[in-house]
């Protein structure tokens, strides 16, 4: 990103408009055929620093460029404490960068108000947290419908359909204490999709699941991806990497392969091809009684 913008460019950015110079920056990074609005979500030159109690600030994200296309599954890997959760929080508009730009589709959200960011997050982003919470007094279908932006009737129908997709069609009226750990995680993932987000952010989505259920969840992510949703998952699970279209590495706040075209396409194809070759039957189905 250019460090010396004209006054007009600065005013355009403050108003949430991408300037020609900014678009040119994107087009010359990683993929010359892509402009801002070709991405579902993007970061440009993002820095995130945290105070360290009087010493030098901790740099969690160091001049990060990242983008995901609609219908792309990106896995983010790296050591613990390397900034992966911070990356998800900044992408998901849960935390603000110290500097840099953020875009959702063709909208520059860098200078939006708190209320505008909250609305954009609710309308465009779904979250699958590692430590999710279901309200104990609500049924599965009520938990899924809770964050909806739709009218209540449509929300209930959509919530029921999502739970059926996740193999929980016979658990609609069960409360969380009547569900296994894996079933509760599937309820949480279904809830993340209730508003038909353009972007799905997942923190260790298979971390608490057995291999079969994890594969079933990832197969559902592929179905979501086929519907045009960009899926971005922080993970330590090699299985998630096998399903991803692209794997990027974040170490000490430095992101490698963050833009389409920066990773090795042959390595990506080999990784996914090896997974597909190892299958002798269709992916596992999520049964209602599986944990």
Show which residues each predicted segment covers.
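ABC ATPase NBD coupling module
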Residues: 109-125, 226
């Amino acid at each position: 990103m250019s460090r010396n913008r004209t006054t007009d460019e600065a005013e355009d950015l403050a108003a949430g408009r991408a300037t020609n110079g900014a678009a040119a920056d994107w087009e010359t990074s990683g993929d010359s055929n892509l402009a801002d609005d070709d991405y579902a979500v993007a970061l440009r030159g993002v820095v995130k620093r945290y105070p360290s109690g009087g010493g030098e600030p901790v740099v969690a994200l160091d001049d990060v460029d990242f983008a995901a296309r609609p219908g792309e599954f990106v896995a983010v890997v790296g050591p613990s404490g390397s900034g992966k959760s911070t990356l998800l929080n900044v992408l998901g508009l849960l935390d603000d960068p110290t500097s840099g730009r953020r875009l959702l589709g063709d909208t520059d959200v860098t200078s939006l108000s708190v209320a505008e960011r909250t609305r954009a997050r609710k309308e465009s982003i779904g979250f699958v947290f590692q430590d999710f919470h279901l309200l104990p007094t609500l049924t599965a279908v009520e938990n899924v419908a809770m964050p909806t932006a739709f009218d209540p009737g449509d929300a209930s129908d959509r919530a029921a359909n999502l739970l059926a997709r996740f193999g929980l069609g016979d658990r609609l009226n069960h409360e969380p204490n009547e569900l296994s750990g894996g079933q509760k995680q599937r309820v949480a993932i279904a809830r993340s999709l209730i508003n038909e987000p353009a972007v799905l952010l997942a923190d260790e989505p298979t971390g608490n699941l057995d291999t079969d259920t994890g594969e079933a969840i990832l197969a559902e992510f592929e179905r979501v991806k086929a519907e045009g949703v960009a899926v971005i998952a922080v993970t330590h699970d090699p299985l998630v990497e096998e399903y991803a279209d692209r794997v990027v590495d974040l170490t000490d706040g430095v992101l490698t392969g963050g833009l389409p075209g920066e990773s090795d396409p042959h390595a990506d194809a080999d990784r996914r091809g090896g997974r597909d070759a190892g299958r002798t039957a269709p992916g596992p189905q999520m049964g209602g009684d599986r944990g």
